[in-house]
């Protein structure tokens, strides 16, 4: 089995066809076909089902790709780590960040990171755990920073608490309920949530129930944070978001918090990464920059392993 064959299989799996994979790899399509056929003969199994509109993995192919992706990621990391330890500034860092992490930790980290590693490609994924779990396991994602999930990470991953968090209610500036001071005052409001926040609808409903209030009326459910912000700025909708959103200057002219008296808890912000394997120097530097910029008012613990 050759390294190039693993690379070829992963490329086809990611792009869904020989033609697209060959274009991505800058290979002739017959050469790519020959590479896959040779590997399938060596393994004695079909890795793909050939269809008119492309190729899909067989169950055995899916298992192979999981392992091959991890190997490719480790080779990339090894190459990056050696170069960076030797004083080089090239490579790639892939970080999965929640909205709270984007707003609270990323802004202060970007400039010093780019100054230290100007040629490292930084790939930022907006998401949350556990949707990023597969990438963390196979090494295609270096680390995650975002809300702690109710389920503990997989055994091969390690979790570190960065800070405790809270939420706020926000709406457009000039909102009719801008002077509300309790959730009860907001009982008749209409709400919006976004699917990029884990369990947003469920947590909003549970919060109202805890205070003896009927479930809030969910009028708009968006697939992106941008859609939600546009909806908020152009309607009387409300939403509940991490308190870090108040630090996002581009929103301040259009949206404002509604300071209700109730404490609105939010999941702790954590980082998740693979256990037993060090990050590359560039990835570790970025994560350390984020640690240094943890909100000072937060109850932070010093790098425990959970």
What are these language model-derived features?
Residues 128-141, 147, 197-256:
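Hydrophobic hinge/microswitch elements
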Residues 53, 83-102, 116-120, 164-166, ...:
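Interdomain hinge and pocket-entrance segments immediately C-terminal to HTH DNA-binding domains
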Residues 90-151:
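Central regulatory/effector-binding core of bacterial HTH transcription factors
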Residues 147-148, 177-181, 189-211, 279-288, ...:
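Secondary-structure junction motif
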Residues 202, 229, 243-256, 262-306:
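C-terminal effector-binding regulatory domain of bacterial HTH transcription factors
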Residues 40-59:
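A short LG(V/I)-centered, amphipathic sequence patch enriched
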Residues 156-191, 195-196, 274:
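Flexible hinge/capping segments at coil-to-helix
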Residues 10-31:
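Short helix-boundary/capping micro-motifs
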């Amino acid at each position: 089995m050759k390294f190039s064959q693993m690379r070829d299989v992963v490329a086809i799996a990611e792009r869904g066809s020989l033609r697209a994979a060959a274009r991505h790899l800058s290979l002739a399509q017959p050469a790519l076909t020959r590479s896959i056929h040779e590997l399938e003969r060596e393994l004695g199994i079909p890795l793909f089902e050939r269809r008119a509109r492309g190729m899909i993995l067989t169950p055995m192919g899916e298992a192979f790709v999981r392992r091959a992706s991890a190997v490719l990621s480790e080779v990339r990391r090894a190459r990056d780590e050696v170069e960076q330890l030797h004083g080089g500034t090239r490579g790639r860092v892939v970080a999965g960040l929640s909205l709270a992490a984007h707003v609270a930790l990323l802004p202060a980290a970007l400039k010093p990171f780019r100054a230290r590693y100007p040629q490292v490609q930084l790939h930022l994924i907006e998401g949350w755990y556990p949707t990023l779990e597969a990438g963390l396991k196979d090494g295609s994602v270096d680390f995650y920073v975002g809300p702690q999930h109710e389920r503990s990470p997989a055994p091969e991953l390690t979790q570190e608490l960065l800070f405790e968090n809270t939420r706020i209610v926000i709406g457009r500036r000039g909102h009719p309920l801008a002077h509300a001071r309790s959730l009860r005052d907001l009982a008749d409001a209409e709400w919006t949530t976004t699917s990029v926040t884990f369990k947003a609808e469920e947590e909003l409903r549970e919060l109202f129930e805890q205070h003896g209030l009927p479930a809030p009326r969910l009028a708009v459910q968006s697939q992106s944070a941008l859609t939600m912000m546009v909806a908020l700025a152009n309607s009387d909708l409300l939403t509940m978001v991490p308190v870090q959103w108040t630090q996002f200057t581009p929103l301040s002219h259009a949206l404002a918090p509604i300071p209700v008296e109730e404490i609105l808890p939010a999941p702790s912000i954590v980082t998740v990464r693979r256990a037993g394997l060090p990050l590359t120097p560039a990835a570790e530097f970025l994560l350390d920059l984020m640690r240094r910029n943890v909100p000072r008012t937060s109850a932070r613990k010093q790098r425990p392993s959970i």
